[in-house]
Regions:
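Single conserved hydrophobic/aromatic residue that forms the stacking wall/gate
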Residues: 1-7, 13
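Short loop/turn microsegments at loop-to-beta-strand junctions
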Residues: 8, 28, 94-95
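Beta-strand-rich structural segments
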Residues: 8-10, 32, 99
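Generic N-terminal leader/processing signal
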Residues: 11-12, 19, 43-45, 104
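A positional/architectural concept
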Residues: 14-26, 30
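Long terminal segments
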Residues: 24, 36-39, 45-46, 51-149
């Protein structure tokens, strides 16, 4: 399943649309809604009191996972995901990432498209049930990259 994703706008997955809204706060706080914008599906919150960038992912009030930037990724970004045994690997350009499951199976491939006015990512997600979670991690990575620039 392919998701063409305009970060900061609408995210379309087949017949589903996610709307992302940022909140004014210390650190990034991104809320994900369904297309009607009536039902909040998830939240990505930056933890500001940590040595290295760290984001917590929430469904309702429950923290379901974290993404941490590892400090010593000299030639390519290194992130640590604490969610369902997932692992993420990125390339040195910080445009392409692969998320794998605990047995090494591909959960998602993420690639950034160039020549767009906004950050645009294409997400190839193996299981549609993981779409929201993959989107949350992509938003966290994009927010971390924005904080550096």
């Amino acid at each position: 399943e392919i998701l063409r994703c305009l970060v900061g706008s609408e995210m379309c997955i087949r017949d589903r649309v996610y709307v992302v809204k940022g909140q004014l706060s210390w650190g990034h706080c991104l809320k994900i809604f369904d297309a009607s914008e009536e039902h909040e599906l998830g939240t990505v919150k930056e933890q500001i009191f940590s040595w290295w960038p760290q984001f917590e992912l929430y469904e309702g009030s429950d923290c379901i996972g974290t993404l941490k930037k590892e400090p010593w990724g000299w030639f390519k970004p290194r992130y640590n995901i604490d969610f369902n045994g997932w692992h993420i690997e990125g390339d040195w350009t910080e445009w392409d990432y692969t998320i794998t499951g605990p047995d090494g199976e591909k959960v998602a491939a993420i690639s950034k498209e160039l020549l767009h006015w906004t950050d645009t990512y294409v997400l190839d997600i193996a299981d549609p049930e993981d779409a929201l979670y993959v989107l949350m991690f992509v938003l966290a990575i994009d927010a971390e990259k924005c904080s550096r620039n």
